Regions:
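Structural recognition of the beta-strand scaffold that forms the well-ordered cores
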Residues: 47, 77, 119, 139-141, ...
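Divalent metal-binding pocket/active-site signature
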Residues: 28, 54, 97-105, 109-131
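Surface-exposed amphipathic alpha-helices with a cationic face
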Residues: 61-68, 105-119, 156-163
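Charged catalytic cores and adjacent phosphate/nucleic-acid-binding surfaces used
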Residues: 1-25, 36-37, 59, 83-98, ...
Length: 192
């Protein structure tokens, strides 16, 4: 059964520090607004990938469960983890926070221990990118709607093809208007 899924988005619980002396700020999208837009776009699933926290996922799931209007939107746990080099890794299906500041290898190991799946977001963006380290992830984000240069997504696609990796797209939504900009059609199989 195919589902339309948003694989890379943030809400007001995202915890990204610009500098050590700065308070965390990443986006101001509310839980209600995130679900409302997902509903209006006809999304079947949303993976909340807040920076360095699972907060926002739990609150989104609770709000969804309290409002019948959103009952058909599946909400899944995920996190965007900042490695020791500043590069990011997306972790899907985890249930415990993976602390920032770990090496890429440590992050990947922890994702696997939790039974999750890893993805390299914006692997060839101008700043804080995994580049060749993306090979260690399960998937590669070949299209990130926030990449400002035209070559980053093309390089990510070429990299994924050369390394025979699963390709996904991400809205990387930090504002409400970009939620659902990149939707992945996933095939879900139910085991009896």
């Amino acid at each position: 059964m195919p589902i339309n899924a948003e694989l890379h988005c943030h809400n007001s619980f995202s915890n990204f520090h610009v500098g050590d002396d700065e308070p965390p700020y990443d986006c101001d999208v509310s839980i209600r607004d995130q679900l409302e837009r997902s509903h209006n776009l006809g999304l079947d699933a949303i993976f909340v990938t807040n920076h360095n926290t699972l907060d926002g996922y739990r609150q989104l799931l609770e709000y969804k469960n309290d409002h019948a209007k959103f009952k058909n939107i599946n909400v899944f746990p995920a996190e965007e983890i900042t490695t020791d080099t500043g590069a990011h890794v997306l972790a899907y299906g985890i249930h415990d926070v993976i602390s920032p500041g770990l090496s890429l290898e440590e992050v990947i190991d922890e994702v696997k221990k939790q039974g999750g799946v890893s993805s390299a977001p914006h692997p060839f963006s101008l700043l804080d990118a995994l580049r060749g380290g993306a090979k260690k992830c399960d998937m590669v984000e070949v299209f990130n709607s926030n990449n400002v240069d035209i070559l980053s997504n093309a390089r990510a696609t070429e990299f994924a093809l050369d390394n025979n990796m699963i390709q996904v797209a991400g809205s990387d939504s930090h504002v409400l208007s970009t939620l659902g900009r990149c939707v992945n059609v996933l095939m879900i199989f139910y085991l009896l």
